[in-house]
């Protein structure tokens, strides 16, 4: 593939903003007033820039000048003093782009039939505070008779802080949700964020390559149902679908891969944060569970999760393979599964030979060396190339990441497979016996006349399509595969159950004397597995760096107050963020929304699992400590960051092999607070990027959804090939395991077709 030097990715326009009429103008103004409390304008009492002093947090001239001086002094090579002053005085809630992002966030809340608690409580609060000036409702929820819109910003901030510590779960969640909304909008659209933080949507030395010419099937306009016939229809173009397509096409079978998402070539990647969240992920960037306790990110474009994942290649560990085999699934300790993993490993070019560590990953490696913990460098699916790219979360312009859209699907296409983007499958079709799958049915939506996908669907060609096939493979991932099966009439009560999420909590280290620029370089090229077996049964945590794209990490920082939130943006180039990734023992479920037919998720991290997560946070804090962090910030409410009181003297004197919990009494006292901290959902902040097990493989129909060949129990010619068939959580990033299972399942399907 030849490089194309055009300077920056081709912009991908967003659709028009949705209508805002689900809230009144008065309610929107009250919302903006609350967001003022999250990210306020900060100025001096004598400032001539801010004329309405009620709209800012006011400091004395001395305090304000000192805040600016301290910020500049603490950030070597940071923004100029005049820019810091301008940024502090800026009021984000009045910016139109900031408001638009808040609108988009609220408009795509998944549970629109029963709005999540944020919007419910806002409606309750806003009705009381806007219809009854000086009423009991305002007093009850805010502690003030005067409505929020009439309060100075300092009071708005105080209200949010009181909600964050309220005994009422709903108010604590409201505070958390408002903070996340404001921080996300600020990181995506602030006119100052990039200049203050150093972040750029365009990677250094960006040079895209030519993408594969997919030649997607186009359906003519018409009123009737359009029919297509093939040997195998594969629903989903992600890690499972891509592997399956290659194997079956190379075996000589007619294959059609369909996906509800669209393909974006390297010339459009990485996208901006706003466009990437909208086009490359499901649900506008994040699903929320029914309790809003955990945010779930999963790929939603052509290539699925493989388009946006972070290149990490872990083989499934032996103790997990043995656990799965003990469930009556001997495949997992067989040489056949070894062969499948080896084929995947070789094809994706999993290697660590050319990795160049960025400062954030190096901090992990330095930390485990100083602490004497197990861990190391993790292979990448980059074919032995350096791939110093920290923005694959928003798509990879270099074409070096050998995921489905770059490697597997092109190989399938070269072997004769066909492809169809923009096709949302509603259900599997069955023969008259109700058992034998004979195809799928759904709705196809074209691109617009200019080849874009931002125009309203009603302005594009839409048509019902039936695809008739001898075999149907569902590879929609753990969110969509069970939903498609359920909507197809599969009655097995296990469909959608046994969902594992690898729930994570975060720790950020501020390395004030170092330019981390953590959005540059490999996202996860290091790991710690010292704590992966905390219960003696294979449940624990893996510690890893995480993506430092601002909307993904700045928005999930713990909100303490308005000044701290603004200063965080200035510290961003010095921040490295890490995750405690939990191999969850306990599970949830996925089910179709009764109105929209989209996935709904019922999951709460259990007390058993979250205790392991806390142990991971403690370990991450120790890594940050010994790696020289000047501030350690677990993303937990009510916990103050650790800032060395001695200027880092004890950190500098730390001896390798020593546990700093026993050498620094201040740090030990803070760790006790961390160990006692509340990370209980729904008010604690949890995220998931790995979904597994919702169509799990089992030895009998009573305990799972598919048999050891991937065939759906009680059905014929219907298979599932993706991470949803995992018998439990993998405990490692699941890409390689999902691909290996798809390799096994699709080769079995090919053998059946060959007779």
Give the ranges of each region predicted by the language model.
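Acidic/polar surface patches and capping/hinge elements
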Residues: 8-185
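N-terminal Rossmann-like FAD-binding beta1-loop-alpha1 element of flavoenzymes
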Residues: 223-257
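Conserved redox-cofactor binding core of oxidoreductases
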Residues: 177-221, 331-432, 437, 441, ...
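Rossmann-like flavin
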Residues: 140-144, 148-176, 186, 302, ...
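Short FAD-binding loop at a beta-strand-to-alpha-helix junction that anchors the flavin cofactor
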Residues: 709-729
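FAD cofactor-binding and catalytic pocket of flavoenzymes
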Residues: 492-624, 631, 641-645, 688-693, ...
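N-terminal FAD cofactor-binding segment of flavoenzymes
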Residues: 253, 260-319, 360-369
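Glycine-rich loop(s) and the adjacent beta-strand/alpha-helix scaffold that form part
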Residues: 247-274, 295, 301, 414, ...
């Amino acid at each position: 593939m030849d490089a194309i030097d055009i300077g920056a990715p081709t912009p991908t326009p967003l659709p028009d903003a949705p209508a805002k009429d689900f809230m009144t103008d008065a309610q929107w103004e009250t919302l903006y007033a609350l967001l003022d409390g999250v990210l306020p304008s900060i100025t001096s009492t004598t400032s001539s820039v801010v004329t309405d002093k009620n709209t800012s947090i006011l400091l004395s001239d001395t305090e304000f000048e000192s805040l600016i001086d301290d910020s500049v002094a603490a950030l070597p090579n940071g923004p100029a003093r005049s820019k810091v002053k301008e940024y502090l005085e800026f009021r984000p809630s009045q910016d139109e782009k900031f408001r638009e992002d808040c609108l988009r966030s609220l408009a795509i809340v998944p549970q629109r039939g029963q709005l999540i608690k944020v919007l419910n409580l806002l409606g309750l609060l806003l009705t009381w505070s806007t219809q009854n000036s000086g009423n009991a409702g305002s007093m009850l929820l805010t502690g003030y008779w005067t409505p929020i819109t009439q309060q100075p910003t300092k009071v708005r901030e105080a209200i949010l802080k009181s909600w964050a510590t309220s005994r009422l779960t709903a108010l604590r969640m409201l505070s958390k949700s408002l903070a996340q909304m404001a921080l996300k909008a600020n990181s995506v659209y602030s006119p100052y964020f990039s200049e203050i933080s150093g972040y750029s949507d365009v990677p250094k030395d960006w040079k895209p390559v030519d993408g594969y010419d997919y030649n997607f099937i186009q359906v003519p306009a018409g009123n009737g149902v359009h029919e297509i016939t093939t040997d195998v229809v594969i629903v989903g173009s992600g890690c499972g679908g891509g592997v399956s397509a290659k194997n079956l096409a190379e075996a000589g079978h007619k294959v059609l891969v369909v996906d509800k998402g669209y393909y974006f070539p390297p010339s459009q990647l990485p996208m901006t944060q706003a466009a990437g969240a909208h086009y490359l992920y499901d649900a506008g960037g994040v699903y929320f569970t029914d309790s809003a306790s955990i945010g779930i990110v999963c790929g939603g474009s052509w290539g699925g999760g493989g388009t946006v994942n972070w290149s990490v290649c872990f083989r499934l560990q032996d103790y997990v393979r043995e656990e799965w085999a003990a469930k009556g699934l001997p495949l997992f300790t067989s040489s056949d599964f070894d062969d499948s993993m080896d084929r995947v490993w070789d094809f994706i070019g999993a290697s660590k030979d050319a990795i160049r560590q960025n400062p954030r990953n190096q901090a992990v490696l330095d930390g485990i060396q100083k602490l004497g913990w197990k861990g190391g460098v993790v292979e990448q699916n980059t074919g032995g190339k350096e791939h110093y790219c920290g923005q694959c979360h928003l798509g990879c312009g270099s074409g070096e990441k050998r995921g489905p859209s770059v490697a597997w699907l092109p190989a399938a296409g070269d072997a004769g497979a066909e492809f169809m983007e923009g096709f949302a499958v509603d259900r599997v079709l069955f023969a008259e016996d109700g058992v034998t799958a004979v195809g799928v049915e759904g709705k196809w939506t074209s691109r617009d006349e200019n080849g874009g996908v931002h125009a309203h669907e009603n302005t594009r060609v839409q048509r019902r399509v039936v695809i008739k096939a001898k075999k149907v493979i569902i590879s929609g991932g753990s969110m969509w595969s069970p939903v498609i099966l359920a909507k197809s009439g599969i009655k097995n009560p296990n469909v959608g159950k046994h969902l594992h999420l690898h729930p994570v909590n975060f720790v950020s280290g501020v390395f004030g004397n170092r330019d981390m620029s953590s959005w540059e370089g490999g996202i996860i090229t290091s790991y710690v597995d010292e704590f992966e077996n905390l219960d003696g049964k294979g449940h624990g945590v893996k510690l890893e760096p995480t993506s430092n794209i601002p909307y993904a990490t700045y928005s999930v920082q713990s909100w303490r107050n308005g000044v701290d939130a603004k200063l965080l943006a200035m510290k961003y180039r010095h921040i490295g963020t890490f995750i405690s990734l939990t191999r969850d023992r306990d599970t949830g479920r996925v089910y179709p929304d009764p109105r929209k037919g989209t996935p709904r998720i019922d999951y709460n991290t259990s007390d058993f699992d979250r205790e392991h997560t806390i142990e991971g946070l403690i370990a991450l804090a120790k890594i940050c400590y010994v790696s020289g962090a000047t501030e350690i910030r677990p993303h937990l409410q009510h916990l103050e960051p650790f800032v060395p009181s001695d200027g880092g003297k004890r950190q500098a004197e730390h001896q390798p092999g020593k546990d700093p919990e026993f050498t620094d009494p201040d740090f030990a006292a803070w760790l006790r607070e961390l160990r006692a901290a509340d990370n209980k959902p729904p008010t604690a902040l949890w995220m998931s990027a790995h979904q597994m097990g919702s169509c799990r493989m089992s030895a009998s129909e009573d305990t799972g959804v598919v048999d050891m060949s991937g065939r759906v129990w009680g059905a014929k010619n219907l298979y599932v090939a993706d991470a949803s068939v995992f018998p439990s959580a993998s405990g490692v990033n699941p890409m390689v395991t999902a691909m290996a299972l798809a390799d096994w399942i699709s080769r079995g399907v090919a053998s059946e077709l060959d007779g």
